[in-house]
Structures are given as C-alpha cells and as structure tokens.
Amino acid sequence: MSDKATDIANLLAPTVVSLGLELLGVEYLPAPGGATLRLYIDVPLAEQPERIINVDDCERVSREVSAQMDVEDPISGNYTLEVSSPGVDRPLFNLEQFGRHLGESAKVTLKLPQDNRRRLQGRIEAIDEAAGAITFIVDKAEVVVSADNIDKARIMPDWVALGLAPSKPTGPAPKRPKPKTNSSSNEPAAKKPRAE
C-alpha cells in the first residue's frame, strides 16, 4: 500500500472492526477527475467459511466510513469510495495475509526490480516475519522478496479446484462436413423455375 493508503487504513480500521468485520487493505488511486478510495473488507478469520461478506456488509461499512471521512477529511478534493469483498483473486496487503495463503499461487508487482523483473508469479512458500520477507517458488526456484518492495499482490485462484475451470474437450476435434456441391464440372447450376 502507498503511504497515503496506509494512513487511511490505520484511520478506518477501528471503524470497520467495530462493525464486526476486518479491513484487509486500502487502495488509494489519485486521478485528475477525482481519486478512488477502495476498501477491501472481509469477515474475521474465525468466522470463515461459515459467514461471507455480503452487500449489506459493504453498505454498512460505506455509510460508517463516509461519515468518518467527512469529519476527518484525509483526502482533499473529490473522491469515490468503493467498498468491496476481496473476491477469489483477493489482494494481499501484509505478511499476515500472505501467511494465510501459504501454498497458494500469487501474482506480485514489485516497486523496484529484483533480478531484472518487476513482476512475478509463483507459489507462496514461506514467510519470515523477522526479516519482513516472503519466499516464493517461481519457475522451480526460490525467490525471496522484501514485503516493503511489494507494490501489489493478488492470489491466483485455482479454477480447477474451485470447479470453475472451463471444460476441455477430450480427443480429436470433430470434423466438419464439407459443403455438398450439385455439380462437379464447370457447368453453371440449373436455374430454379419461377412460380407464376
């Protein structure tokens, strides 16, 4: 998260917690016509999977946070507030969240290049809280990334395990029949009689 997003997350987290929910993270996206402030919320880990985020939860958080933002006013100018569930391709904002998803695959964008790359995709292998680092397995090799160097990270859902993968046809593709032609020579086709 950016410094601005971190400050806003720290400001709003107690409000979200008071509603019995968890603030996973904040995205602050400035733009010339007005910024977008996106909050990702979820139910506390202890209540999952029996309870999931629903539209009513998002609306409650939106109302409470809007009122708080009007009073605290941490963003100058116009902005749009969006409150969202994390979805199956959930964003990851901190070491604790990476730790919850050990063994799963993630897409990561780095702030600064590491080994000549800013993007990586790999399995989350280990978390080192003392060093503030995450170990990924990328192309069968270990890659250790400082959490401070992560700009964005998202889980890459296993669509097959979720039962949502598109089905692949088995065997060879069926052959399409060739269009039939009435004449095998260069003679023009007979004209159809007109009904009069």
UniProtKB/Swiss-Prot annotation:
<dbReference type="InterPro" id="IPR028998">
    <property type="entry name" value="RimP_C"/>
</dbReference>
<dbReference type="InterPro" id="IPR028989">
    <property type="entry name" value="RimP_N"/>
</dbReference>
<dbReference type="GO" id="GO:0005829">
    <property type="term" value="C:cytosol"/>
</dbReference>
<dbReference type="GO" id="GO:0006412">
    <property type="term" value="P:translation"/>
</dbReference>
<dbReference type="Pfam" id="PF17384">
    <property type="entry name" value="DUF150_C"/>
</dbReference>
<keyword id="KW-0963">Cytoplasm</keyword>
<feature type="region of interest" description="Disordered">
    <location>
        <begin position="163"/>
        <end position="196"/>
    </location>
</feature>
<dbReference type="InterPro" id="IPR003728">
    <property type="entry name" value="Ribosome_maturation_RimP"/>
</dbReference>
<dbReference type="GO" id="GO:0000028">
    <property type="term" value="P:ribosomal small subunit assembly"/>
</dbReference>
<comment type="function">
    <text>Required for maturation of 30S ribosomal subunits.</text>
</comment>
<dbReference type="Pfam" id="PF02576">
    <property type="entry name" value="RimP_N"/>
</dbReference>
<comment type="similarity">
    <text>Belongs to the RimP family.</text>
</comment>
<keyword id="KW-0690">Ribosome biogenesis</keyword>
<protein>
    <recommendedName>
        <fullName>Ribosome maturation factor RimP</fullName>
    </recommendedName>
</protein>
<dbReference type="InterPro" id="IPR036847">
    <property type="entry name" value="RimP_C_sf"/>
</dbReference>
<dbReference type="InterPro" id="IPR035956">
    <property type="entry name" value="RimP_N_sf"/>
</dbReference>
